[in-house]
């Protein structure tokens, strides 16, 4: 092994550590961003499913309070305390009953706890009775 090879090898010693020092935090940030997107998507799907359940009840029962109860029962306990439910049900059969479930979602990641996103699920069904 020549002198030139030894000098080249010594100058590359901290390269891998430096690359890891830059790459690992970047990967962690990307993983946290993916986690946030998944949590938001899951919450959005839950809101839509709960609104659909509330609209089913609103389409068959004249009492809006029963539709609100159906929405709260369809949601996870963590979400049911924080949602706002709006039920619009006309008295005329054949018209559309609308249920809107909304929530201000706070991010899960500690670095983004200050950030909130408005999520909303909406369902419309024809009044049957």
Predicted regions and their residues:
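Alpha-helical assembly-interface signal, strongest on the long, hydrophobic N-terminal helix that forms
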Residues: 1-70
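Short, conserved structural patches
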Residues: 2-4, 60, 64-129
């Amino acid at each position: 092994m020549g002198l030139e090879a030894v000098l080249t090898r010594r100058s590359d010693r901290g390269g891998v550590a430096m690359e890891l020092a830059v790459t690992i935090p970047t990967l962690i940030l990307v993983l946290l961003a993916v986690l946030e997107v998944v949590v938001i998507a899951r919450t959005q799907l839950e809101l839509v499913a709960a609104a659909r359940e509330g609209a089913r009840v609103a389409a068959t029962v004249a009492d809006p309070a029963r539709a609100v109860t159906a929405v709260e029962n369809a949601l996870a306990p963590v979400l049911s305390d924080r949602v706002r439910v709006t039920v619009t049900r006309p008295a005329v059969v054949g018209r559309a009953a609308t249920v809107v479930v909304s929530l201000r979602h706070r991010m899960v990641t500690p670095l983004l706890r200050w950030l909130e996103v408005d999520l909303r699920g909406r369902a419309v069904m024809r009044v049957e009775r």
